[in-house]
């Protein structure tokens, strides 16, 4: 049989083609990897945009601007709420409560929102800590005995009867910002130093750091909030906005 001898140049070309092919495949894998990473980033951005759009929709439908709620307070509240809900931290995800400390203490700055039925359940006064400020709260702390309010997200727990009557325990969800809430006995309770009868004063009565509500509405508020709902205490703090793990998660 006659043997066919390949030209040296052709053989060399074949060798080069077989050498190059694996490199091209490796580059393809890198391209796929980068695509997956980029898609993940895009998905995260989409999630944030969706949460903000939902928050704005709720804000507009319920006309929360007419009740004095800051639009930023609502946007941040809903974003963190979504993070907690997705983590399974909320036993009751139907209710979201926003405390807007950008407002005067003489304003009704607690908003209890029924997300399931799309309505405001209650809007009332809420006290800030005595060392957080007079009419406006502007100092915040997570330190025991500071007598200041703490910013951020909380998950409500069970109730108990204490020196202020029916009270609601709170679990702070943000390390360094409010995770000492239980150690500090920061709870929702009723108080006679806050309410309509104090509106004409220079400022409402203040607490030792608790988000206290008017005594006559304490039972109603606590029963709406108890057992695993989300409570968010807001103030326009750039440091908190940058450091919050729930806002930046």
Residue ranges and their predicted role:
Residues 29-207, 215-224, 229, 240-249:
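Cell wall/extracellular polymer interaction/catalysis modules
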Residues 1-32:
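Bacterial Sec-dependent N-terminal signal peptides
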């Amino acid at each position: 049989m006659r043997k066919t001898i390949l030209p040296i140049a052709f053989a060399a070309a074949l060798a080069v083609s077989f050498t190059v092919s694996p490199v091209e495949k490796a580059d393809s894998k890198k391209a796929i990897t980068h695509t997956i990473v980029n898609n993940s980033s895009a998905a995260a951005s989409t999630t944030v945009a969706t949460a903000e759009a939902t928050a704005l929709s709720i804000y507009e439908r319920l006309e929360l601007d007419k009740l004095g709620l800051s639009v930023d307070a609502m946007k941040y509240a809903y974003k963190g709420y979504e993070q907690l809900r997705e983590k399974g931290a909320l036993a009751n995800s139907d209710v979201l409560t926003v405390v807007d400390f950008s407002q005067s203490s003489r304003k009704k700055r607690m908003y209890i929102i029924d997300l399931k039925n799309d309505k405001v359940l209650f809007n009332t006064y809420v006290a800030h800590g005595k060392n957080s400020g007079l009419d406006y709260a502007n100092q915040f702390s997570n330190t025991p005995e500071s007598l200041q309010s703490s910013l951020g997200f909380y998950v409500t727990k069970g109730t108990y009867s204490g020196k202020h009557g029916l009270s609601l325990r709170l679990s702070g969800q943000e390390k360094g910002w409010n995770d000492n809430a239980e150690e500090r006995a920061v709870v929702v309770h009723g108080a006679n130093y806050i309410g309509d009868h104090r509106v004409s004063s220079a400022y409402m009565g203040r607490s030792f750091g608790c988000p206290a509500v008017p005594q006559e509405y304490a039972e109603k508020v606590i029963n709406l909030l108890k057992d695993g709902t989300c409570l968010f205490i807001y103030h326009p703090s750039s440091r908190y906005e940058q450091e919050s793990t729930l806002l930046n998660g």
